[in-house]
């Protein structure tokens, strides 16, 4: 059974008791994080599912309320004892954005694997039982 947990669904500004955009998906013990807004680490900690076993992160787009929590999340992931590679999926220019944010977390005990997915060409990512596809949507 697929479990879906909204870790944060607030707008552009974090409020007490409401974190920015992040969703954690779990199926058969495998987990994927979708977006990583501020407060994502707190949401995961409160949920109690743990950090080390998160298989991948999918970034939907590069608005700050969807990615500003990435450096802290990566540091927490490193402090959890993770040494296996961690995959980040996202639209172009994924490497540019992740490398810029990773300046805050330059030395991690695991490698980051980047998988750029574009809605302009057929592309598909896979992690465990999850299949990730990019599709165009309107977002205001």
Where are these regions (language model features)?
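Binuclear metal-dependent hydrolase catalytic cores
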Residues: 1-140
């Amino acid at each position: 059974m697929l479990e879906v947990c909204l870790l944060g669904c607030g707008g552009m500004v974090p409020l007490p008791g409401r974190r920015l955009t992040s969703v954690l998906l779990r199926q058969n013990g495998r987990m994927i994080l979708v977006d990583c807004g501020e407060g994502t680490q707190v949401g995961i900690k409160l949920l109690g599912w743990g950090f080390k076993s998160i298989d991948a992160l999918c970034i939907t787009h590069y608005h700050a309320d969807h990615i500003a929590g990435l450096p802290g999340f990566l540091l927490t992931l490193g402090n959890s004892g993770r040494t296996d590679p961690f995959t980040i999926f996202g639209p172009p220019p994924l490497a540019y954005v992740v490398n810029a944010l990773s300046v805050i977390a330059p030395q991690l005990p695991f490698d980051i694997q980047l998988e750029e997915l574009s809605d302009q060409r057929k592309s598909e990512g896979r992690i465990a039982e999850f299949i990730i596809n990019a599709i165009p949507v309107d977002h205001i």
